[in-house]
């Protein structure tokens, strides 16, 4: 086995170890965990709503880039052998009639309420944070050991069937002289949101106060830095709320599903 293969096997082992700790009850944001491995957002819906969401994602690929779709009733994915989507995420959200009913570290009981749940794994921008760091671009929420800040915007997504809502974005402060580089690096990963959707001027997105994110934690913006916004996989949760979806299970923002797929797989 050469050095590349050893590094790849080590990264996969780290991903599997992380999923095991979450299955055993550890609750922590996943930014910076298992560097080099693809992370994913989750939304699981009864089969009756699955086509609506599939169409919603197809019409809004920047915010909802699908990496995998499970068979109805199956809590497994080919992106992580031996995993269980009901237990291997640190924190889940259970939604009822468009409202957040509870957050749990194990979704097995809620999942069992419907025998035809269809799970969608959606690309996450955590995936390209390792390449940003390797280029010497600081990722502030990793430095600070907190969750990434996420914001609802005034940008409407294209509706599909019974689903509608606005785009959610994540924000990372980037030095002004490195914004173009950060955009180019992330742009090489279109399956995990790709390049930013907006740079600077948060008010144009309807964001009035960066210190009060709708999801996640606020981070500092230093002199000479610019807030840079990427489409975010929490967008489906905004659609669940806006559309009054009767039942859904999602990851909690910032608490992702870590796959066995290297981030280089989605590099173009």
Curated annotation (Swiss-Prot):
Belongs to the D-glutamate cyclase family. Its EC number is 4.2.1.-. Keywords: Lyase. Gene3D superfamilies: PSTPO5379-like (3.40.1640.10), PSTPO5379-like domain (3.30.2040.10). One of its GO terms (molecular function) is lyase activity. Transmembrane segments: none annotated. It comes from the Bacteria. It comes from Pseudomonas syringae pv. tomato (strain ATCC BAA-871 / DC3000). Coiled coil: none annotated. This is Putative hydro-lyase PSPTO_5379.
């Amino acid at each position: 086995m050469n050095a590349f293969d050893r590094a790849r096997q080590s990264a996969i082992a780290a991903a599997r170890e992380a999923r095991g700790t979450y299955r055993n009850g550890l609750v922590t944001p996943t930014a910076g965990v298992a560097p080099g491995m693809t992370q994913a957002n989750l939304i699981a819906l009864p089969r009756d709503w699955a086509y609506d969401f599939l169409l919603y994602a197809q019409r809004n690929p920047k915010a909802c880039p699908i990496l995998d779709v499970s068979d109805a009733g199956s809590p497994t994915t080919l992106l992580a052998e031996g995993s269980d989507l009901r237990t291997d995420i640190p924190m889940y959200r259970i939604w009822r009639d468009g409202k957040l009913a509870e957050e749990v570290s194990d979704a097995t009981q809620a999942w069992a309420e419907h025998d035809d749940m269809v799970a969608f794994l959606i690309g996450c921008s955590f995936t390209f944070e390792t390449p940003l760091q390797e280029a010497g671009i600081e990722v502030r929420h990793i430095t600070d050991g907190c969750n990434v800040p996420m914001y609802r915007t005034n940008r409407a997504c294209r509706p599909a069937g019974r689903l509608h809502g606005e785009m959610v974005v994540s924000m990372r402060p980037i030095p002004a002289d490195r914004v173009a580089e950060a955009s180019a690096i992330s742009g090489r990963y279109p399956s995990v949101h790709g390049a930013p959707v907006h740079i600077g001027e948060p008010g144009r997105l309807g964001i009035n106060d960066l210190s009060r994110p709708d999801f996640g934690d606020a981070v500092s913006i230093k002199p000479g830095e610019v807030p840079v916004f990427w489409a975010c996989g929490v967008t489906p949760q905004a659609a669940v709320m806006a559309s009054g979806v009767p039942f859904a299970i999602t990851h909690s923002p910032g608490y992702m599903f870590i796959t066995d797929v290297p981030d280089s797989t989605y590099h173009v």
